[in-house]
């Protein structure tokens, strides 16, 4: 069975979960708390040496990290990924935009609001 190692409040993990639900694919979710060092254990690093979530355990026993790589893997052969070359390129265009031009700002703002105390000078 497809297994996702992820953190429920992570946007990158959420989009993988959303794709799995949209495709009605069975999966197992393993909650990993990166704030408690769970991505730095020997066991986790053997799956993903970068120590990041999400990481997917594929049916053949291999591991696939990075949310957009997982999304592309899941979408292959499904209605989520167009059959034509330009359509697939446009999907990748949006995935690159989301990951590199949009997500960094959202993730930083969310982390500041969620993890820094209200009186922290770093919140300014």
Regions found by a protein language model. Give the residues of each.
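GST-like domain detector, emphasizing the conserved glutathione-binding G-site
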Residues: 1-9, 14-123
